[in-house]
Each structure stands twice: as structure tokens, then as C-alpha cells.
């Protein structure tokens, strides 16, 4: 079996992203080809987290579950999504939700509670998708969802905007990827970067 390691460090895709003077030199042809990865679906939407409309919310959905490993900062001051992720003990995850514009850091109990609410909504909707798409559907639990948050520190976490965008994220999930879709996901998590950053590595594990 082949495992894929994909590094996405960016976030925002509308055609205007490529017209923006700061990133006008970025061309999709400049990036390596990125292959389809079985078992992965992804989608991006605008949750209106920025004044200028852009993709700012990305969902990775692992229909069969994904084994994962985490490396966390050693700092004692961490964001609420890291507190959530460190408590996840499931062997597999089924969803990874990433937002930009807000780091969910120094947001206190409200920031953590927001993730708890989102995980309940997202796990329920992904369970419904399992029922629609799979022969042997699984009930996905809130503790099988991980969060990535990046952006401004100390601002109230935009719970309402993100929750209201989840149905659209689910509807837009695509099981087949190509370079454009990976680019869109990378641009959906971009904060201060001027260009999207994408890379892929394939490795064989075991005999």
C-alpha cells in the first residue's frame, strides 16, 4: 500500500486570488502535479471570515477513516483547537476542518465550546453522508474530528459563520482530486502567504 504525505500551507481560492498583485506571479503550472488519493474527499467554501470574499474554510473527509500522527508545540500557551486535538484518542479520524482568519488562541472556554458544537454538527452530517454513500455506513463521532485554526490571536471565534457553512462544505465534497482542487484547498488555508505552497510525497510502508 502507498501512503501519501501532503503539505498544504495556504488558503484562499477565487479567480481574484490569481489576479491579486501580490500573487500575480503565481501560476498553477509552476507547481508539481498532485495525484488523486483514494479515500480522501475535500471541499472549500467562503464562510465570510474576511471582508473581501475568499475561500477560508477547508474540509478533509476520510470516508474509511485515516490513521494519523500529531506533533504539538511544547509551549504552555496553546490555541483551543490544539487543546481539542490533544484530547483525541481515536485511532482513526474521519474529518479535518481548517479555518483561516482566526487562530482560536486566547479565546478561553468559549473558543473550546465552539469547537465542541462544530464537531457535533459536522460528525452528524458526515454520518448522514456515510448513510448515503457507503454500503456499510459508520456513525462518525465528534471525537473523530480534528481542527486546524490559523490567523489572528485573541479575537472571538466565528462560531456562527463556520457552523452555517458546514452544509455547503458537505455538499461540495469531491472524492476525486486534481491539481486545481489541491490548489484550491491550499489557498483556502492561506493567511499572510503571498503564494500557495503544495507538495506531495509517496512512500511504501511494509513489504
Name each model-derived stretch.
Residues 56-59, 81, 94-98, 143-146:
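Structural motif
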Residues 1-10:
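Short, Lys/Arg-enriched N-terminal segments with co-localized hydrophobic residues
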Residues 95-108, 146-153:
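Short glycine-rich or small-residue beta-strand-to-loop segments that form or flank ligand, phosphate
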Residues 120, 124-128, 139-207:
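Glycine-rich, mobile lid/loop segments that gate access to catalytic sites or pores
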